[in-house]
């Protein structure tokens, strides 16, 4: 990356992503009581097994974990607008913001419904903590079921996400209680493994991946303080440097339709086999995760002779812009799954950026997982200043390079 590009990536959206995961910092003392690797543990490639393998549902604690006086457990019904609104308000005010309090993730109600209502989701895995005197939601954690493949071993897991505790209650150490309670409820369904990500380093990641950003609306990114200029990089030069060609390399790309589900399932599962860690998608999974929803998930396919040959997908996660008189929203697209069999991967991601621009996104973000890193320099992505760690719960295996990670968690 040349100096101009390095200087241009000033305020980094990764700061938001990292802080979203860092808000709850749990010391290692708690994690050393859990079936996860210790900091100094190293496993060779032949190790691929649970830490604890003799679990039985009848041995799982039947009663909920005790909360501090004045607080009560609740189940958040993701199908109800009021419950989604409570989750939205908690996350908006307490889950994500950058150090300068300029950007805050803005999870829409529709996004939360998409993220948490996957096929066969378990209602009571959407766990809330309410302050009894006001009935206000002050804590939340969620999980959804997922079929994972770890080094060719297929495992039913829970994907854990959205751990959030109100800022005023951080001293009450609610986060470990939330984690233990979600673990208990997952175990009651005879599921003993989980996958999760965090910006903070915990015992111990299976892999670590950095975020990279491709500027789209250059002028806006500079005006809101997301990116910056310098003496060598003027506004006009920056706009020219990051100009996006509006012509697609794959001419027949179109929005995914219901009739594409079978072909897309085949393309996805066949492609993902090459990675050490990946999900296995059922037809119902494909329908849920990839059917386009405006301002939530964008999926484009190229169909040739009745077969799905290429896939582009990205999801929308905007941020509120605070204290700016001209703009109040930063529209960010996040790379999801992208597969090509007819062109180069560079051409595919170039088309993804073009489609993000057509849908009025300001920036296109991607982790260095799967094949993504190979195109970042050529397509003028800027490197983020932090990393996202991938973790497995109750599973021991060798760590791997992020290019061998084949899953994107929201």
Curated annotation (Swiss-Prot):
It catalyses: N-terminal glycyl-[protein] + tetradecanoyl-CoA = N-tetradecanoylglycyl-[protein] + CoA + H(+). One of its GO terms (biological process) is protein localization to membrane. SUPFAM superfamilies: Acyl-CoA N-acyltransferases (Nat). Tetradecanoyl-CoA binds at residues 30-31, 162-165, 171, 173-175. Pfam families: NMT, NMT_C. Keywords: Acyltransferase, Cytoplasm, Transferase. GO terms for cellular component: cytosol. GO terms for molecular function: glycylpeptide N-tetradecanoyltransferase activity. Its EC number is 2.3.1.97. It is found in: Cytoplasm. Belongs to the NMT family. Heterodimer composed of NMT and AK2; AK2 myristoylation stabilizes the complex. Adds a myristoyl group to the N-terminal glycine residue of certain cellular proteins. Myristoylates adenylate kinase AK2. During the asexual blood stage, may myristoylate proteins such as ARO, CDPK1 and GAP45. Probably by mediating protein myristoylation, plays a role in the assembly of the inner membrane complex during the early stages of schizogony and in the formation of rhoptries in the late stages and thus merozoite egress. This is Glycylpeptide N-tetradecanoyltransferase. It comes from Plasmodium falciparum (isolate 3D7). The gene is NMT.
């Amino acid at each position: 990356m040349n100096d101009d590009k390095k200087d241009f990536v000033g305020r980094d959206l990764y700061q938001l992503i990292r802080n979203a995961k860092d808000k709850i910092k749990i010391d290692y003392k708690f994690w050393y009581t859990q079936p996860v690797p210790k900091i100094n543990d190293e496993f060779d490639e032949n190790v691929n097994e649970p830490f604890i393998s003799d679990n039985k549902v009848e041995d799982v604690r039947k009663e909920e974990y005790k909360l501090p006086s004045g607080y009560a457990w609740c189940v958040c019904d993701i199908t109800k607008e009021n419950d989604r609104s409570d989750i939205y308000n908690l996350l908006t005010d307490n889950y994500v913001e950058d150090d300068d309090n300029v950007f805050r993730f803005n999870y829409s109600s529709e996004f939360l419904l998409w993220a948490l209502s996957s096929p066969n989701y378990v209602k009571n895995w959407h766990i809330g903590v309410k302050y009894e005197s006001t009935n206000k939601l002050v804590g939340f954690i969620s999980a959804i079921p997922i079929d994972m493949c770890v080094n060719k071993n297929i495992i039913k897991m829970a994907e854990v996400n959205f751990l959030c505790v109100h800022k005023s209650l951080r001293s009450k150490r609610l986060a470990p209680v939330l984690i233990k309670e979600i673990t208990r409820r997952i175990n009651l369904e005879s599921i003993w493994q989980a996958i999760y990500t965090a910006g903070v380093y915990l015992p111990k990641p299976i892999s670590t991946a950095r975020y990279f950003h491709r500027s789209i609306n250059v002028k806006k990114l500079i005006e809101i303080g997301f990116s910056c200029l310098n003496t060598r990089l003027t506004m006009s030069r920056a706009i020219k440097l990051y100009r996006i060609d509006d012509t697609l390399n794959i001419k027949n790309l179109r929005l995914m339709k219901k009739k594409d589900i079978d072909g897309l399932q085949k393309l996805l599962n066949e492609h993902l086999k090459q990675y050490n860690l990946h999900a296995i998608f059922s037809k119902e999974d494909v329908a849920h995760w990839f059917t386009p929803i405006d301002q939530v998930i964008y999926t484009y396919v190229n169909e040739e002779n009745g077969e799905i040959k290429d896939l582009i997908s990205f999801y929308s996660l905007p941020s509120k812009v605070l204290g700016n008189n001209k703009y109040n929203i930063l529209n960010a697209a996040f790379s999801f799954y992208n597969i090509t069999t007819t062109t180069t991967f560079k051409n595919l991601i170039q088309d993804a950026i073009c489609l993000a621009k057509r849908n009025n996104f300001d920036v296109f973000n991607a982790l260095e997982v799967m094949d993504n890193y190979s195109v970042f320099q050529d397509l003028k992505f800027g490197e983020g200043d932090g990393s996202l760690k991938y973790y497995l719960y109750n599973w021991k295996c060798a760590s791997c390079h992020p290019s061998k990670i084949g899953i994107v968690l929201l």
